[in-house]
Curated annotation (Swiss-Prot):
SUPFAM superfamilies: Triosephosphate isomerase (TIM). It catalyses: D-glyceraldehyde 3-phosphate = dihydroxyacetone phosphate. This is Triosephosphate isomerase. NCBIfam families: tim. It is an enzyme of class 5 (isomerase). InterPro entries: Aldolase_TIM, TIM_sf, TrioseP_Isoase_bac/euk, Triosephosphate_isomerase, Triosephosphate_isomerase_AS. It comes from Chlamydia pneumoniae. The active site is at residues 99, 169. The gene is tpiA.
Length: 254
C-alpha cells in the first residue's frame, strides 16, 4: 500500500526567531516553485514556534509544525517545562517523543516517554515516537530486542486507531557522520512493523509511517528513499539550511 511520506527537520537548539523566519521564507519559496507530495515538518525550539506558525499562515506554505519535547501533564509545578495546551495555542501539530538525546542526556525512561505519547495523542496532536539502539547493543546483536522493548513500552498506553509515527534513529549514527546501510535500515523498519502488528493489528502496521534518522544528508538521502519500508526521514543538521533540507525532501516526492 502507499503510505504518506514525511520529512521532518529537527532543529534541536538552533536558530533565533529572526533566523527561523528567514528560513521559513526560503523554504516556502522553494515549495511554491516545486511543490512536493511528502509532508514536510519542522520541529523548532519553543521560542520560534509562534513566529513560524505566523509565517506559515502568511506564506501559505504547507509545513507541518512540531515541537521537540513536551511534558505529559497539562499544567503544574514543573519548572522549565512546556504543556500541550501551550503548544496547541501556537499551532503545533506534532511532537517528537523519546529522541535519543532526551533518553540519554536527560534520562527519560520508557514509562515517562509512554506517558508523553499518550498525552500528545489525547490532545489531538501526532506523537513521533523515536527508537534506536546504541553501537554497543548493535554489536552485541541485540538491536531488535532493544527496539522491540522501546516500541512496546512507548506505545503501551495507546489505543488501536490512535495516530502516531515512528522514527528509527540508531544512536551511533546521530550527529556522528556515520550512516546506517540501507539494508540494515530496511531490516529494522520491517521489524518495527512486525512489532506494531503484534501490539495493534496488521492493518495498523501497514498504515503506519516509519521514518529514518541518523546523519541524513543530501548525498545519502536517496538510498533511504529506495527502501520499501522507509516512509520518510527525521533530519538533524541537514535541516538547518532551507535549500539542503528541500533537496533531502525531494527523495520522498512520490
Amino acid at each position: 500500500m502507499t503510505r504518506q511520506s514525511y520529512v521532518l527537520g529537527n532543529w534541536k537548539m538552533h536558530k533565533t526567531i529572526q533566523e527561523a523566519k528567514e528560513y521559513v521564507q526560503t523554504l516556502a519559496s522553494l515549495l511554491q516553485g516545486e511543490p512536493l507530495s511528502c509532508t514536510i515538518g519542522i520541529a523548532s525550539p519553543f521560542t520560534s514556534l509562534r513566529a513560524i506558525h505566523e509565517m506559515i499562515n502568511t506564506t501559505g506554505a504547507f509545513l507541518w509544525l512540531g515541537a521537540q519535547n513536551v511534558h505529559p501533564e497539562l499544567s503544574g509545578a514543573f519548572t522549565g517545562e512546556i504543556s500541550l495546551p501551550m503548544l496547541k495555542e501556537v499551532g503545533v501539530e506534532f511532537v517528537l517523543v523519546g529522541h535519543s538525546e532526551r533518553r540519554h542526556i536527560f534520562g527519560e525512561s520508557d514509562a515517562f516517554i509512554a506517558s508523553k505519547v499518550k498525552s500528545v495523542a489525547q490532545a489531538g496532536l501526532v506523537p513521533v515516537l523515536c527508537v534506536g539502539e546504541s553501537l554497543e547493543v548493535r554489536e552485541e546483536g541485540k538491536a531488535h530486542q532493544v527496539i522491540k522493548k522501546q516500541l512496546l513500552l512507548g506505545l503501551e498506553q495507546m489505543d488501536n486507531g490512535s495516530e502516531f509515527l515512528i522514527a528509527y534513529e540508531p544512536v551511533w549514527a546521530i550527529g556522528t557522520g556515520k550512516v546506517a546501510e540501507a539494508s540494515d535500515v530496511q531490516d529494522i523498519h520491517m521489524f518495527c512493523r512486525e512489532v506494531v502488528a503484534e501490539r495493534f493489528s496488521e492493518a495498523t502496521a501497514e498504515e503506519i509511517s516509519i521514518l529514518y534518522g541518523g546523519s541524513v544528508k543530501v548525498d545519502n538521502a536517496q538510498r533511504f528513499g529506495q527502501c520499501s519500508d522507509v516512509d520518510g526521514l527525521l533530519v538533524g543538521g541537514a535541516s538547518l539550511e532551507g535549500q539542503s533540507f528541500f533537496e533531502v525532501a525531494k527523495n520522498f516526492n512520490v
